[in-house]
Amino acid sequence: LVTSVAQPGFWYSLVYTLVVLVFGIRRIHRRPTQYVRWQTWTLISIQAIPLFLLPYWILPWLGDLGCFDDGWGRTLADALFPITENYPPGREYWRAFGLILAWPLFFWNVFTDQPMMAWLVISVIQTFVLLPLAIRRWGKGVYCGWICSCGALAETLGDTQRRKMPHGPWTHRLNFVGQFFLLLTLILLEARLWSWCFPDSWLGSWSLSIYHGILHGIPLLSYEWTVDLFFSGILGVGLYWHFSGRVWCRFACPLAALMNIYARFSRFRIIADKKRCISCNLCTAVCHQGIDVMGFAQRGIPVEDPQCVRCSACVEECPTAVLRFGEVDRDGRVVRLDLLEATI
């Protein structure tokens, strides 16, 4: 713990976790539904345990006990948390963030100097196997609304700001920002793979130049500064009080842009009962992803939009209980409704 406290990342993560905890409890009191209670405590638990205690206390403590000195413990630690002199605990325990934050949101375990096969396998399984399967059943919100640390802050600290998200066709054009960032990560990935596979060839050298140029490149204009720090951190959080807590998630997150593709094949829907809809527009107003929920409800058709993160605000705010989370079959027929009650 002493070595962890010496790291700036420890204090950043501590403050982040405390904010999620405090504002999460406030959210539970503000929205006393079964769904919000389970969702919020899940977000708090994930932020507190695997995203804070694990890298900054549990793993360093196990290392001090000698659990990673020999045997299978050392084999596992060497594969996931390499020994380093540049990180106070002696191993790169911060890479444990990659157990929760999938590529390309957390890209540092993939974009390494030498290939780390364990993390490459984990990242492939996370991003291209587990996420598509989970989203197929529960929608994009299974990750954005229940697991991701960005979503945790948005649903807790940003909960009272959700009505500030701009709506309308022009806002959808801003989604290209996330698509562009996703394209950059794919270019980075391809360049990194070519440089690994052909290190001594002109193709490998050229790919390596592209990789370093985009990732590190011009100071303050590189991917690591512009996207990872400015857009996701400074701008994303700074705009909470102007355009809601989901600015980064909706417009700029490269992982969300990828999951939008997966979500188009999802069976998750917000089921609407047209007979009960009074066109009050409350459901659309509280959507911090900019979805025209009322437009679907007025027509009595299930809400189908890849932007939905299952926050449940529209379901809870509806005064006539028009909306419910559910699942449809291939023909669009409702086959299942969520067991967790999202209305008061």
Where are these regions (language model features)?
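Non-ligating segments of multi-cofactor redox enzymes
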Residues: L1-I301, P306-Q307, A313-E316, T320-I344
